[in-house]
């Protein structure tokens, strides 16, 4: 594909150690010479890293700069790459369209801290996740937030996009704030839907 598009691959950014994110990294590196970046704290579970990074580190990716954010929960060593100047973030499996990654290693408290960190980003931030689970996540979101008019509309928009073989990601933080149940979990109206205490 790279040859067909006349593109060069010079950077591989790893968010976490799961096989669906790292299988093929060594082969890609050998074919392209791309440099591999990943979390220093998780290096023992990752392919050989050219750059080991930690929270707040700034790296160069092409002509852009990315800030490393610790985003544990899905896995303990999960990181995200925040391109502040472009309002883009590569979240891997920590935050997705209408959802977040399952807790394989972290706790609910750890994941909640990560989700609250995402809430601090500018609403115009574009979220590039590691998977496109938009339709299944929409069905779950509607099961816990059935009166959310924007969510109802979004589920229809997703159906239309998929019917036309179009992507549903990236998404914007602004849209996620309106429709993602994991980012809305502290809102009184959301808690009321689930008969949760407001504390």
Where are the predicted features?
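Active-site HxH/HxHxD metal-binding segment of metal-dependent hydrolases
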Residues: 1-67, 153, 157
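Catalytic core of the metallo-beta-lactamase
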Residues: 1-7, 46-145
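Surface-exposed loop/turn and secondary-structure junction residues enriched for glycine/proline
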Residues: 12, 25, 49, 56, ...
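Intrinsic structural disorder
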Residues: 13-15, 34, 131, 166-167, ...
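Residue-level signal for threonine
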Residues: 39, 75, 172
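Accessory terminal helices/loops
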Residues: 116-126, 135-199
């Amino acid at each position: 594909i790279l040859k067909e598009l006349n593109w060069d691959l010079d950077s591989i950014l790893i968010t976490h150690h799961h096989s669906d994110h790292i299988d093929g990294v060594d082969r890609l590196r050998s074919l392209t010479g791309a440099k591999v970046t990943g979390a220093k704290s998780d290096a023992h579970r990752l392919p050989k890293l050219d750059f080991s990074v930690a929270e707040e580190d700034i790296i160069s990716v092409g002509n852009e700069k990315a800030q490393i954010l610790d985003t544990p929960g899905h896995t303990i060593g999960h990181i995200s790459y925040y391109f502040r100047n472009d309002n883009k973030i590569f979240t891997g499996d920590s935050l997705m369209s209408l959802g977040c990654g399952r807790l394989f290693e972290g706790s609910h408290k750890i994941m909640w801290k990560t989700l609250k960190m995402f809430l601090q980003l500018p609403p115009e931030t574009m979220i590039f996740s590691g998977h496109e689970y938009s339709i299944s996540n929409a069905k779950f979101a509607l099961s816990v937030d059935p009166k959310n008019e924007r969510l109802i509309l979004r589920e229809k928009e997703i159906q239309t996009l998929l019917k036309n073989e179009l992507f549903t990601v990236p998404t914007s933080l602004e849209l996620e704030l309106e429709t993602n149940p994991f980012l809305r979990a502290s809102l009184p109206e959301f808690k009321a839907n689930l008969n949760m205490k407001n504390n």
